[in-house]
Each structure stands twice: as C-alpha cells, then as structure tokens.
A protein has these predicted regions:
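Hydrophobic adenine-recognition pocket in adenosine-nucleotide-binding enzymes
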Residues: 8, 84, 116
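Conserved GNAT acetyl-CoA-binding A-motif
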Residues: 106-117
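Acetyl-CoA-dependent GNAT
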Residues: 34-87, 138
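Conserved acetyl-CoA pyrophosphate-binding loop and the N-cap/start of the following alpha-helix
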Residues: 88, 92-101
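C-terminal "cap" of GNAT-fold acetyltransferases
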Residues: 139-150
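A short, well-structured alpha-helix characteristic of acyl/acetyltransferase catalytic modules
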Residues: 1-32
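Conserved active-site alpha-helix within GNAT-family acetyltransferase domains
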Residues: 95, 118-136
Length: 150
C-alpha cells in the first residue's frame, strides 16, 4: 500500500505532540533530551506550519498517520528530519517516506542534508541506502552530517 504525504495542519498538533514525546524519538533527538509540555509544542507547531522556509509533512498509510518529515530550507539546501510512529518502526516506512519526499523535490536541483546521531543505527542505515554521503562527523555531539545532491 503506497504512503500518502501532505502538509501538516492544525489538526495534526496532538499527534505530533504524542510522537515528539516518545522515548525513542527523544533518545534520537539532537535538539532535546526530555519531554516537552503541550503549551511549548503547541506554540512551536502553530508557528512552524506557517513558516515560509520550513515544511512539515504528515505521512499516512491508508488513513492512519504513521510519521512525519520536516524540511528546513536554507539557501539551496533542504535539511531533513523525520520520525516514524513506534508501532510502524522497522517495516521500511522511514526509507519510503524520505524517498518520496526526495523525489517530490528532486527536480529543484537541491542539496539534501540530515544530521543523525551515531547511535541511531536505523536512520544512519536509511540515509546511506538513499545515497547520502557522510559530509563530516561532529565528535562533540556524536553525530554525522549526511549530504545528497540531486
């Protein structure tokens, strides 16, 4: 069954809040190390979905929301981050959703980048499978920066 991708809207606020507070999401996050409160998430989410140089996409399988892909645009670079619902992990959906997003924007001659913790083996594997190359390693933050030119 093919995945569908659409821009996030206000109706996705609670689901994205739930995902943001999942144990594995927090563990693999570069930006934070603890749960967030609904007020903080709500403020961020409402602002984020209106930003000109960022996009948040909800990924669904049939009518079930199974993950999201976030893109931050800087010049001609697309910085990617994503998550998959804990019930849908290890089934290939992370690869499928990122591949679909990359294909959606491929004709725009962009550079895709992603920062991933070394310990996040699943995401490291997915970005390599998608053709990303390691641009550099940040020893302090224990992360890789991946890059893909289209």
């Amino acid at each position: 069954m093919p995945l569908t991708i659409r821009k996030a809207n206000i109706n996705d606020l609670l689901k994205t809040f739930e995902w943001a507070n999942e144990k594995e999401v927090i563990k693999n996050s570069i930006e934070r190390s603890k749960k967030i409160e609904i007020n903080e998430h709500s403020t961020w989410f409402k602002k984020y979905i209106t930003l000109k140089f960022s996009s948040l996409f909800i990924v669904s399988l049939r009518s079930e929301k199974i993950g999201l892909v976030r893109i931050d645009y800087k010049k001609k670079e697309f910085f990617l981050s994503y998550l998959v619902d804990r019930k849908k992990r290890n089934k290939g959906y992370g690869y499928q959703m990122l591949n679909k997003i990359i294909k959606k924007f491929k004709n725009k001659k962009k550079v895709f980048k992603a920062r991933v913790k070394r310990s996040n083996l699943a995401s490291n594997s997915i970005f390599i499978k998608l053709g990303f190359k390691i641009k550099y390693t940040n020893q302090d933050k224990n992360t890789f920066l991946y890059r893909l030119e289209t």
